Curated annotation (Swiss-Prot):
Chain sites annotated for binding ATP: P97, P98, A99, R100, G101, L102, G103, S104, S105, A106, T107
GO molecular function terms attached to this record: ATP binding; homoserine kinase activity
Keyword Transferase: yes
Uppermost EC category: transferase
Gene that this sequence comes from: thrB
HAMAP family, per the entry: Homoser_kinase
SUPFAM superfamilies assigned: GHMP Kinase, C-terminal domain (SSF55060), Ribosomal protein S5 domain 2-like (SSF54211)
Name of the protein: Homoserine kinase
Length: 315
């Protein structure tokens, strides 16, 4: 396979994600219409050269150099396609804040895979990119919806194959994501979880997940209220999020159908009907404000197209 011409440029747009949604720990996630944009350009130099240029209005940043997730993902593509690495520049426009539970790491992984693949005229199929993305991230709940879009349930089957189910999301159900000006790493959020759980907690979560998925499919308020409940991770993680339970209670009092930690946190997801999203958003921001924490709570739609790319110069 030939190395792309100097100057070839690919633009990749990757949606943010909210994972778990309460009971769907490490298997359920939805893509949202908040995006990071990555522009990849073939530049002069060998495969060890990877230039990362970030544009952000709020001080967010990604780690540069060979350890960067974008570069690591690109390397996986080169290895899988059996090609020699080549020099790349990645210009990143950040809108998805890192360490907030919105899948910023997943956007970097997915962008690196798609960008490196597309700049070589896409030798790897999407199924292979999904496999690589899950391998790099270590769990599927962010990278799968980030790549495919929509609400995705991903599980490893008895044959050890990843099975992905695209689940329905009723048009009447909207998402409010309260994003505080504090950070929480996924590794820290995982450290507080127990290594073993009671069987009763596992059974509770299986039932809750079934109720939630049916509620999201049909738009049934009661099923969403009863299904957005977790016993596996949230009881241990709420204590890491200052004011988290107060924000959750404020959202529910304002009419939210359900509330959960978005991914590993600290952002908080509230599901609501479209006619009361503004009230829920204001209540969540106010609850954090009362504790001296700045936040914003955008009203977001589920993004169904997943990651997109286009060639803007070169062949």
């Amino acid at each position: 396979m030939s190395i792309p011409n100097l100057g070839k440029k690919i633009i990749v747009t990757v949606p943010s994600t909210t994972a778990n949604l309460g009971p769907g720990f490490d298997c359920l996630g939805a893509a949202l219409d908040l995006y990071n944009e990555f522009i990849f350009t073939r530049i002069e130099g060998d495969g060890d050269r990877f230039d990362l240029i970030m544009e952000s209005t709020d001080g967010n940043h990604l780690r540069g150099g060979p350890e960067n997730l974008v570069f690591r993902a690109a390397q996986k593509v080169w290895e899988s396609a059996d090609v020699s690495p080549f020099a790349l520049e990645a210009r990143v426009k950040l809108a998805v804040p890192p360490a907030r539970g919105l899948g910023s790491s997943a956007t970097a992984i997915v962008a690196g895979l798609i960008g490196a693949n597309a700049i070589m005229n896409s030798p790897l199929p999407k199924e292979k990119l999904l496999e690589l993305a899950i391998d790099i991230e270590g769990h599927p709940d962010n990278v799968v919806p980030s790549l495919l879009g929509g609400l995705c349930l991903t599980a490893r089957s008895s044959s050890q194959r990843w099975r992905i189910i695209r689940c329905d999301w009723h048009d009447s159900i909207k998402a409010v994501i309260a994003i505080p000006a504090i950070r929480l790493s996924t590794s820290e959020a995982r450290r507080v979880m127990p290594k073993n759980i009671p069987i009763s907690d596992a059974v509770t979560n299986m039932g809750a997940l079934t109720l939630l998925l049916n509620g999201l499919k049909t738009g049934n308020d009661e099923l969403i209220k009863e299904g957005m409940f977790d016993k596996l991770h949230e009881p241990y993680r709420w204590k890491l999020i200052k004011g988290g339970l107060e924000v959750k209670e404020a959202a529910l009092q304002a009419g939210a159908l359900g509330c959960a930690i978005s991914g590993a946190g600290p952002s908080i997801l509230a599901l609501c009907k479209s006619n009361n999203g503004k009230v829920v958003s204001q209540a969540m921001v106010k609850a954090w404000e009362n504790l001296g924490i700045a936040s914003r709570a955008p009203f977001l739609n589920v993004q169904t197209k997943g990651s997109q790319f286009k060639t803007i110069s070169g062949k």
